[in-house]
Amino acid sequence: MQLQNNRLEQKLSEHHLPNHWQAILKPRSGDKSHSLQRVVELNTELAAITYDLIQQHQPFAVLGGDHSCAIGTWSGVAAALAQQQNGELGLIWIDAHMDSHTFETTATGNIHGMPLATLLGYGDTTLTQIAIPRPKINPKRLVLIGTRSFETEEEKLLQRLGVRIYTMQAIVQRGLDTVFSEAIAY
């Protein structure tokens, strides 16, 4: 709602980008909870929406309050792609953080630090089972770009799985064009 109130729709139209608010998911009135149950509920709803949009071949954008919305977004996309011949999700994650914690490795318990681990099938089963009961991303089809702030546990998980990671240092050394070209070819 805040984005609508701040004229986002008008600004998109000014740039000739078609837009309409198909679905707005929001916590219950006054609910500031980031509880596991509420995150699962919202992401299950979001997965159903993105699943339907992929099935209808509709482009979409998801604007969320934190990274936990990636769980529902990409779970729905992966579920839809799984029904298509040779359909498999590939993802380029551009972020300073690896977002690959589980409840066992996080110091904070913040679910917004867990979406990639969840999408890879690691972590709480109520999160990993959203939309389809299997990992959503093959680690060989996941590339992280721009990481610079992460914990050892996250890095160990991703390295063990063979995820390609380009740190900010790699971007500075090799150049953004080279990194993106390699990521897309991966």
Predicted ranges, named:
Residues 1-186:
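Conserved alpha-helical scaffold segments that buttress catalytic/binding sites
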